[in-house]
Amino acid sequence: HPQIVANSIPFNMEADSLNCSILGAKAVPGTPEFDLFINEVSREITVKAGQKCTAIRRAIVPQAQVEAVTEALKASLRNIPVGDPAVEGVKMGSLVGKDQVEDVWSAVRQLGSCSEIVHGGTPDFDVVGADRDRGAFFPPTLLYCDKPMAAATAHSVEAFGPVTTIMPYHNT
């Protein structure tokens, strides 16, 4: 735009997107890259309870690493206490409200048409220092989409909460 060029007007735009993180084929368990991938995806799922537009919604991994990534993410997420952030040790708080909880459940149901839940995704989970039924809590949830190239829903539906879908790729 001419005004931006002429007057150097600051401009910041956020475009709606389903962000992803892609694990390289040589990043296998025991490598720093694999560990970094697991740490970052786990962090992105749980920071702000996944309520940020830049959160990783799709974890794209080599087919040969799907099981290792899934197990490592599940192990990491099991160590994330959900509840009142004022309580020592709690790592993930609530969603913004009950309407948001229902929106995330709805998105998970839609994603379930092409994915399976491999962690979380159930209303039966522990909440520390708060009442799960009175609050707006949602469990860290992992899905697995076996055929992402044939699953338009996995690339168009965003669960705006602590939800990520693992997707394999087959060639490098």
What is the role of each PLM region?
Residues 1-150, 169-172:
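ALDH superfamily catalytic-core signature
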Residues 155-158:
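C-terminal lobe/hinge of AMP-binding adenylation domains
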